[in-house]
Amino acid sequence: MGFFIQHGLTKPEILYPFLFGIFAVASLCIATLLFPASFSAASRVISWVLSIYLEVKNPIRHTETGRNIPGPSYVWPNGQGDIEKYVQGRSRSEQWQRKYGNVYRIWAGMTPEVVLTRPEQLHAIFKDSDKHTKATNSDSGYFMSRILGQCLGLMAGPRWKLLKGIAAPPFMHPTAVRSIGRIQEHVRAHFHDLETNGNLREGRIHPVQDLKMLPFFIVAEANYGSLTPAMKSELDSLAPARENLMKFVLFGGLARFNISRFFPTEANRQLRRFRSQWRAFNRAAYERAREKHPSAMVVQMYDAVHKGVLTEEQVAQTMDETLYANLDVTTGGLSWNLVFLAANPACQARLHEEISALTPAEEEGYISRNGTYLAACVLESSRLRPALPFTIPQSAPTERVVDGYRIPAGTNYVVDTWGLNVRDEFWAPDNSTYRPERFLNSSNTDLRYHFWRFGFGPRQCIGRYTADVVIRAILLHLVKHYELQMLEEGDFTQDPECWITHPDLQVKCVRRT
């Protein structure tokens, strides 16, 4: 009330119309979220007003010309997130860079994000990535906060270091290498099941639908120890529900705002159901693992909760991150390999020749090595089909200058992975061609800041070593025992509803004789 008293606004004839005006504007905004088709004209007016306000509130100017940083205007309610940024990201990446240049600004909700497209921009930003702060809820709004807002990947500072110390050991390089034999057992069992009960009986394989749960259950064992059939069944049954929740995040609208929690929406009903089931599963898994697998990650996590070091919400969301969130990422990293090998028989033949020369005893060492043709194939696939069109936003602790634009401390950055991995002249002249050989003579120093896969600088994805050995083990088995061929000619079909780049097609997969 101090503001109203100071400015003489406490008289009813002034205060009531003022409050009514605020209520009317708020009601109109909510109406555009609940009934967007009926209030499209109002949405355009709100977009125009907020775009002007946000430009004034978040100035980023060129140090010499004073010109404001270019970029698309804010659009109510989502800005350019998350549909344009992720689902339509491949096409937007090219359009935006062509229209706005090599550095520009987009809006994730009402939060500005500076887009980087060039290798030379990245060193100045990511040299201290361990000191960066991940964007609150990944700039995806309230609904995201209820799924992954407190997970390890979105933490920073002491909390991140503490939780990383608990979550990272099962996924570090020595542990990943020691697990290769166990991973190969999972792979053999999975393909036996596909041949007995799946599409493989008919000589076909869907790179996503037929393989996505294989790496999922391998990681689940690292989290919980050995899994009972009932645990596998419950994890499997939760996957579609969790996948559907991400669609509410992607499409935004009302779910982006805190006020959405007061509405009886289908999104909130599904969220409550999933959170209850997920928490119950993890509690039961903890009690079982305490007896049978005391070193399992779930035991270390819940022990930290009981000591008051972590909250159960942080544990539940981090376990979700390692499984369901990374299910999409690992599936994307694996599945495109099948498509590219099927579409490039000469590369597949070379890989088969290299694998065929191995004895069974040599396979584990081969899977763990980085300089192989298999490793090169995995890298080339991830170059041409980066998991995310734009990276998860994060901010640097100090002011930076990028291409002459002075970026204030705390501003979020994202990297255009298509601009970096594919369109950059570093990969010329055959930027869009699948040619794994390009990685055989490339060192990590050569590739630094030219190639995005697991992040940049000191802070990278903790699951990168496990992801590599899992993908390589699956591809080794696949190419050793089967020949892949394309069933259809033309451009590769992509799942239009997935925020991660996934193929949506079947590949011919015939057992070798």
Curated annotation (Swiss-Prot):
Pathway: Secondary metabolite biosynthesis. It is a single-pass membrane protein. Keywords: Glycoprotein, Heme, Iron, Membrane, Metal-binding, Monooxygenase, Oxidoreductase, Transmembrane, Transmembrane helix. Gene3D superfamilies: Cytochrome P450. One of its GO terms (cellular component) is membrane. The chain crosses the membrane at residues 14-34. It is an enzyme of class 1 (oxidoreductase). GO terms for molecular function: heme binding; iron ion binding; monooxygenase activity; oxidoreductase activity, acting on paired donors, with incorporation or reduction of molecular oxygen. Heme binds at C461. Disruption phenotype: Blocks the production of aspergillic acid or ferriaspergillin, but accumulates the intermediate deoxyaspergillic acid. Its main location: membrane. Glycans are attached at N258, N370, N431, N441. It comes from the Eukaryota. Pfam families: p450 (PF00067). Its EC number is 1.-.-.-. Induction: Expressed during the earliest stages of maize kernel infection. It is found in: Membrane. Its cofactor is heme. Cytochrome P450 monooxygenase; part of the gene cluster that mediates the biosynthesis of aspergillic acid, a hydroxamic acid-containing pyrazinone with aliphatic side chains that originates from leucine (Leu) and isoleucine (Ile). Aspergillic acid has antibiotic properties and was shown to be lethal to mice. Belongs to the cytochrome P450 family. This is Cytochrome P450 monooxygenase asaD. It comes from Aspergillus flavus (strain ATCC 200026 / FGSC A1120 / IAM 13836 / NRRL 3357 / JCM 12722 / SRRC 167).
